[in-house]
């Protein structure tokens, strides 16, 4: 079972946070601080991240399916279906899990979902890029922290959470497991049967074309002036859309 971290009142409506590549449950500090007074906030460490199990040969041979099944097991263990809030790689796994097992999900909030391209093995250029990126944190990442303070508008808490995850990444997953399988983003979005808010940067390269999204349960919002990490780049825009959506999903049950 994946490591699961919790904040807030266990009797409150549940949110499940699912992080992206090279991050962990520790990568949501501002969201946790904002939501934990109203909701039971849970956050997973995906396999090979944080303190969750590492990868083995069998799991790597079917990495996308393994990650989806990991998430479905977590969802099945919860007392009631949560609103799932997910980013990038976590967004893709949450999208696929929500399409396959809508009985386990109350609603979805997806942030710039990683777009699968139909590949069944890691791209060498991507592996090299990620290895170099993670190598920059071998000394604790002080230079990377300072770079983000100069170049981004992220809060200090978000920068520290983002940087602190890197040393816990299973490098074997980076080298052998970073492929996403079937190019099913649009078809999965249009199969969803749960309310879904899908946020992405207007000038990004991973979101579906709005004309392709025909599912009336899915609201795709393209946001100006942000990059891949929408909630960090523009928390006001992110929460202005996400918080009312969560409240509506729970029928205003959040406290």
Q: What feature does the model see in each segment?
A:
Residues 99, 104-137:
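Flexible "cap/lid" loop of the alpha/beta hydrolase fold
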Residues 119-124, 136-190:
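Conserved alpha/beta-hydrolase catalytic His-Asp/Glu region
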Residues 5-54:
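Conserved HGGG/HGGXW glycine-rich cap/lid loop of the alpha/beta-hydrolase fold
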Residues 30, 96-100:
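Active-site signature of alpha/beta-hydrolase-fold catalytic machinery across serine-
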Residues 33, 42-85, 240, 244:
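Active-site loop/oxyanion-hole signature of alpha/beta-hydrolase fold enzymes
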Residues 195-232:
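Conserved loop-alpha-helix segment in the C-terminal half of the alpha/beta-hydrolase fold
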Residues 217-255:
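Catalytic active-site module of serine/aspartate enzymes centered on a nucleophile-bearing elbow/loop
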Residues 86, 90, 94:
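Gly/Ala-rich beta-loop-alpha elbow adjacent to hydrolase catalytic centers
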